[in-house]
C-alpha cells in the first residue's frame, strides 16, 4: 500500500489531477482500497475505489442516454452521501457541470437555482426534495429527469420525469456495455478552462450568483496539497464528510483532498449525529466551521462540570498544563520540548479520554474556515493537544488563500499566504488574491464578474484585511464595516466573537 509521503512525492513530481481522473487512476492502481463508508440504520457499508469509478461511469452513460452532454448542467439536491460524490464524478467526467443545492433550500429557491442554471437533470435525495421540485416543475422547462436516491413515499408518484437511482444505474450499465470507453474518451477531451462545477453563493443585494470553477482550478488546488497547511501526513487517512458538499469548503476537503490522499470518506449519518459519528470514526483530519467547534467547546466544559470531584481536579490540572503547552507552542513552535512534556502529562491526566469522546483522538491536523472564530476557542483546542489552524478562502478562489500552519501560528489571524498565492491589500484595505485557482466568473453575469476580477487577474474578495506582522487579519466584509460618528471603523464580527466568549 502507498504511504502518504509517497503520495505527496507523486503530486509534487507530476502535479494534481482533475477529480474524475484521480478516481480512475486510484481504481486502476488500488481497486480494493475503500473509498466510502456509509452508515445506514447503525450499520457501516463500504464502497471500494473500483466500485466508485464503475458507478461514476454508469452515471455518465445514463446521463448521455437522457441527452446530457458537454457544458450541460446537472444538479444534486441531497445531504452528504456516497451517491452525491459518485454523481459529481460521473457528471464531471463527461464534461458536464455539477450544480449543488443545499438540502434546506425551499421550493422558491429550488426554482431559481434550477432555472437559472438551466439544469437538465436533478438528483434528489428523497421525497422531501422531490416534492420541492415537483411544486415548481412547470417553471423549469430545461429539466427533463429527476433521479431520486431514496424511494420511500415516491413509488406511488405518477410523473414520467421521475426515476429511481437503481433504475438509473441499470440504464447506465446497459449503455456502458455498448461503449465501455465512452466516459474515458469524454474525460480525455476535458480542457482546463472547461467549467467543472458551479457553486451558488448567497447574494446580499440580489439573487445567488453561480460561481464557475474550472477543471484547471480543481487541478491546481490538487497540485498544492503537499504544501497546504491542513493536509495530513497519516497513511490511509480517514475523513468524516459532514460539511455540505454544495459548499466550496466541503467540496475542497472531500472531493479534492480526500480523493487525492487516497483516503476513506466516512459519511455522517446526519448533521445531528456528527458528534457521535466523530467519536466512532476518529478521523485523521477534521475540517470544521466555528459553530461546530463552539458546540464541542461548550459540550466539553459542561461534561467536566457534571463530572466527579476527582475528574474535575484532574481536568483542572490538565488544563493548566494544556495552557502551558499552548503558550509554548505559540511562542516556540510545535517541536518545543517543554510543550511536548506538558502535553504528554495532560493527556495522561484526562485530555486523551476527552479527545476520544470528542472524536479527535487521531486528528493530527484540524482546520477552521468559512467564518471568523474566537481565538479563545482555538486556544482551548490547542491546550487540548489538537491544534486547529484557522484559514481563509472563498468560493471564488477555490477556498485557497491563506492559512496558519504548524510552527507558524498567530491566533486571531488567518495566517500567511498559501504556497502559490499572490496577496495584496488595496488602498482601502480590501484583500486581493491572484492564483490559478481563481474562478472563471459568475454564470450569466458578466457585469458582476468584471466587478470582482480585474484585467490583471486579481480577485477583489470584498473582505477588508490588515497585517499583523506577516500574518493577515480579516477585519470584516467591506460592506459591513460600521463607521462611527467619530470616524472610527468598527467591525461587527469582532463584537460578535467577544460576545460569544463572554461569561
Language model features: what each stretch is:
Residues 46-50, 196-222:
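Conserved AMP-binding A3 loop
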Residues 105-138, 221-240, 271-285, 357, ...:
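Conserved ATP-dependent adenylate/AMP-binding module captured primarily in the ANL superfamily
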Residues 219-241, 245-351, 362:
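Conserved AMP-binding/adenylation subdomain of ANL enzymes
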Amino acid at each position: 500500500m502507498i504511504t502518504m509521503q509517497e503520495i505527496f512525492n507523486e503530486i509534487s513530481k507530476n502535479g494534481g489531477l482533475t477529480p474524475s481522473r484521480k478516481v480512475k487512476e486510484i481504481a486502476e492502481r488500488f481497486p480494493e482500497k475503500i473509498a466510502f463508508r456509509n452508515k445506514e440504520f447503525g450499520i457501516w457499508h463500504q464502497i471500494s475505489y473500483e466500485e466508485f469509478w464503475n458507478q461514476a461511469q454508469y452515471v455518465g452513460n445514463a446521463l448521455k442516454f437522457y441527452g446530457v452532454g458537454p457544458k450541460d448542467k446537472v444538479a444534486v439536491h441531497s445531504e452528504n452521501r456516497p451517491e452525491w460524490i459518485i454523481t459529481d464524478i460521473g457528471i464531471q467526467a463527461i464534461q458536464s457541470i455539477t450544480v449543488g443545492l443545499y438540502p434546506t433550500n425551499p421550493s422558491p429557491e429550488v426554482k431559481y437555482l434550477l432555472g437559472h442554471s438551466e439544469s437538465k437533470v436533478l438528483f434528489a435525495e428523497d421525497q422531501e426534495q422531490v416534492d420541492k421540485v415537483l411544486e415548481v416543475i412547470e417553471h423549469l422547462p430545461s429539466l427533463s429527469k429527476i433521479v431520486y436516491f431514496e424511494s420511500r413515499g415516491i413509488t406511488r408518484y405518477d410523473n414520467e420525469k421521475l426515476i429511481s437511482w437503481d433504475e438509473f444505474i441499470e440504464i447506465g450499465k446497459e449503455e456502458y456495455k455498448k461503449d465501455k470507453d465512452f466516459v474515458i474518451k469524454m474525460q480525455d477531451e476535458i480542457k482546463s478552462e472547461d467549467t467543472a462545477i458551479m457553486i451558488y453563493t448567497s447574494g446580499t443585494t440580489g439573487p445567488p450568483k453561480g460561481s464557475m470553477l474550472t477543471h484547471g482550478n480543481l487541478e491546481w488546488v490538487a497540485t498544492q496539497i503537499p504544501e497546504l497547511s491542513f493536509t495530513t501526513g497519516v497513511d490511509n487517512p480517514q475523513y468524516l464528510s459532514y460539511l455540505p458538499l454544495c459548499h466550496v469548503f466541503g467540496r475542497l476537503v472531500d472531493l479534492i483532498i480526500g480523493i487525492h490522499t487516497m483516503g476513506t470518506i466516512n459519511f455522517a449519518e446526519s448533521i445531528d449525529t456528527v458528534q457521535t459519528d466523530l467519536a466512532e470514526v476518529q478521523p485523521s483530519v477534521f475540517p470544521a466551521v466555528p459553530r461546530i467547534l463552539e458546540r464541542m467547546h461548550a459540550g466539553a466544559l459542561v461534561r467536566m462540570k457534571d463530572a466527579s470531584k476527582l475528574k474535575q481536579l484532574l481536568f483542572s490540572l490538565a488544563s493548566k498544563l494544556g495552557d502551558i503547552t499552548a503558550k509554548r507552542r505559540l511562542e516556540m513552535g510545535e517541536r518545543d520540548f517543554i510543550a511536548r512534556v506538558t502535553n504528554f502529562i495532560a493527556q495522561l491526566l484526562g485530555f486523551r479520554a476527552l479527545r476520544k469522546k470528542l472524536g479527535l483522538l487521531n486528528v493530527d491536523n484540524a482546520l477552521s474556515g468559512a467564518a471568523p472564530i474566537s481565538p479563545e476557542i482555538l486556544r482551548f483546542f490547542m491546550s487540548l493537544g489538537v491544534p486547529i489552524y484557522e484559514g481563509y478562502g472563498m468560493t471564488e478562489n477555490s477556498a485557497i488563500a491563506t492559512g496558519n500552519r504548524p510552527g507558524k501560528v498567530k491566533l486571531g489571524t488567518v495566517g500567511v499566504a498559501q504556497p502559490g498565492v499572490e496577496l495584496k491589500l488595496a488602498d482601502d484595505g480590501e484583500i486581493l488574491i491572484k492564483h490559478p485557482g481563481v474562478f472563471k466568473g459568475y454564470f450569466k453575469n458578466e457585469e458582476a464578474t468584471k466587478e470582482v476580477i480585474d484585467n490583471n487577474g486579481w480577485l477583489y474578495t470584498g473582505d477588508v484585511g490588515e497585517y499583523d506582522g506577516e500574518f493577515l487579519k480579516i477585519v470584516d466584509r467591506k460592506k459591513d464595516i460600521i463607521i462611527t460618528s467619530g470616524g472610527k471603523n468598527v467591525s461587527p464580527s469582532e463584537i460578535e466573537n467577544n460576545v460569544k466568549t463572554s461569561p
